[in-house]
Amino acid sequence: MKKLNTQSPDFQAGLKALLAFETAQNPETERIVADICADVQKRGDAALIEYTNKFDQTNAKSIDDLILTQADLNAAFERIPNDVQTALQTAARRVESYHQRQKMESWSYTDEDGTLLGQQITPLDRVGIYVPGGKAAYPSSVIMNAMPAHVAGVKEIIMVVPTPKGERNDIVLAAAYVAGVTKVFTVGGAQAVAALAYGTETIPQVDKITGPGNAFVAAAKRRVFGVVGIDMVAGPSEILVIADGTTPADWVAMDLFSQAEHDEIAQAILIGTSQAYLDEVEAAMDRLIETMPRRDIIEASLGNRGAMILAKDLDEACEIANYISPEHLELSVENPQEWAKKIRHAGAIFMGRYTGESLGDYCAGPNHVLPTSRTARFSSPLGTYDFQKRSSLIQVSEQGAQKLGETASVLAHGESLTAHARAAEFRMK
């Protein structure tokens, strides 16, 4: 891991270098994805079946072979162990409860002229959820993407999940059952994104696509954005821990590992105010790494993009955190709620030593789909509001038409838009 000290004259340069991440798009990936999207848009189900058989090594004869029914999802739920059933239900219940509180409601008011103004909230009609498949499957992603849509009132929640060599993951399908997914198609990759965006003979066009995927899925989401909405194009996972030295070093070490184990380019950073404590955490990491099944990935991640930063105090640590704008921020300090008030930019803020980031990944309640790569400066976690739309309401009274008409007429003539002005003037006495 890199070692930085805020008192060093080259600290800012070192911090910028630490956060620099090459996000340039791969031209070959973009070309392949463009071809796949165009083909699916043109040939529909036939192209989808062809690509699925090719990339997932399946033997689908028709689109019916790629459809799972509610009975299939229920059967998958019944096959998994009781403790896993309970865990999925507990996580879904907590995520639902949290996202209910995010739900936007319609409102209106009437001004002094009797004109009604307001905002009408409506859910999206249909959304698509992309879920990675195979052995590296993430049932938590199903719950985090589908449940907010369900809470928002979306009528159709369509999930696409690849099944390499026909391998279905019962826990993923059980999560779909618990989270209220209405349809499942066993397709993946850019071809699945294209099918959701453009529609095929069997898969209906959706209004928005959410969910994680590989580079091809990310490229496809970028390509179809504008035809449909997307959640975000997420970068590598990130965690930043601010520690005052009161949390056991082993806990902090494992929290850093929890994000580093995702990917060789994931980022784990620790900011402390004591060199002795940073040394203690480093020693804990050296000891605990021996127990990690994904040791190679963790070591590569920490070597590539990990860091320990020595700050002069917690105020400075919080300012650094605001600059970094991390996906996950742990405030492993005393009085964490007070320090949280100093944080302006973070996807999720985990307050206190008992609030491990992994609890948020699975079952705390808030969404784990979070902005990465410093985009928390201007964007937010996935939520119920992402599956709702706002329409402005305007009902002008007869009296209001006189005053508003006069104003509109003057402004319209100023823009040389005569019909605009006349339309307002016709309603004036």
From Swiss-Prot:
Its cofactor is Zn(2+). Binds 1 zinc ion per subunit. GO terms for biological process: L-histidine biosynthetic process. It catalyses: L-histidinol + 2 NAD(+) + H2O = L-histidine + 2 NADH + 3 H(+). Its EC number is 1.1.1.23. SUPFAM superfamilies: ALDH-like. GO terms for cellular component: cytoplasm; cytosol. Substrate binds at S237, Q259, H262, H328, D361, E415, H420. It holds the Pfam family Histidinol_dh. Zn(2+) binds at Q259, H262, D361, H420. NAD(+) binds at Y130, Q191, N214. It comes from the Bacteria. Pathway: Amino-acid biosynthesis; L-histidine biosynthesis; L-histidine from 5-phospho-alpha-D-ribose 1-diphosphate: step 9/9. Keywords: Amino-acid biosynthesis, Histidine biosynthesis, Metal-binding, NAD, Oxidoreductase, Zinc. Belongs to the histidinol dehydrogenase family. This is Histidinol dehydrogenase. It comes from Neisseria meningitidis serogroup B (strain ATCC BAA-335 / MC58). The gene is hisD.
